[in-house]
Amino acid sequence: MIFCPLFSGSSGNSTFIASDSTKILVDAGLAGKTIENGLLNIGEKPQDIDAILVTHEHTDHIKGVGILSRRYDIPIYANELTWKAMSKSIGKIKEHNIKIIYNNYVQIKDFDITSYKISHDAADPRGYDIRNKNKSVCVATDLGFLSDEIKSHLNNANVILLESNHDVEMLKFGPYPYTLKRRILSKIGHLSNEDCGKAILDIANGKFKKIILGHLSKINNYPELAYKTVLNVLNKSGIKLNKDLSVFMAKRNMPSNYTKF
């Protein structure tokens, strides 16, 4: 499998995942042209994308979904409530490209895909566990906390894109209005750097994992701080980096961490 966050951050998200015969995007939250260029930068063609999976209807996850589907005739997969919530924002989609995920499962060519509920302030937000044979990747961002269901999926994954959204002190003393700060810090908001480190401890089960920290706030975080905070949490608990697991940062404005395994 191949796993590559094309863009990851509060300003826009899209992740490329592939097997030998299947190529998909999870979210397309930037302009269509930007995502096209991101794919080209890793040697992929937009017209070869088999599907776009949508986690939820917020703009930083769907901005380019409609234009990419219309331009390249790409099917869009999401659950029913997410479709209802995003339909006006993404524009007219051809009937055969409207794919509703029922019962939290869909097969796309040789990918077995399970969606799992995440805690976020959207209609019916989902993370995805994407499997090919005995390999698995998970996308877990935009979540206020890790439920047991989420942990069960992340426990068995080889590669995980995990949210490390904000530094709590930067958020508390930053420019956001009080109501927005409360939302971000709530159970339907986003994981802080400290929360992310603790979440990794919860899923460190002896199976080596590559964890990519993503969906960083542009205002209330920066990569060096996120990485340092997460590693401090892991080091205090005796986790050995590059033995028990590896940790990398996703980039905001360009493709990063192209992983083939």
Predicted regions and their residues:
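Metallo-beta-lactamase
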Residues: 80-134
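Conserved beta-strand hairpin/beta-sheet module of binuclear metal-dependent hydrolase folds
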Residues: 1-42, 126-142, 159
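Active-site neighborhood of phospho(di)ester-bond hydrolases with catalytic His/Asp-centered motifs
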Residues: 26-29, 50-57, 77-80, 138-141, ...
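Structured catalytic core of nucleotide-sugar glycosyltransferases
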Residues: 4-14, 57-61, 87, 113-115
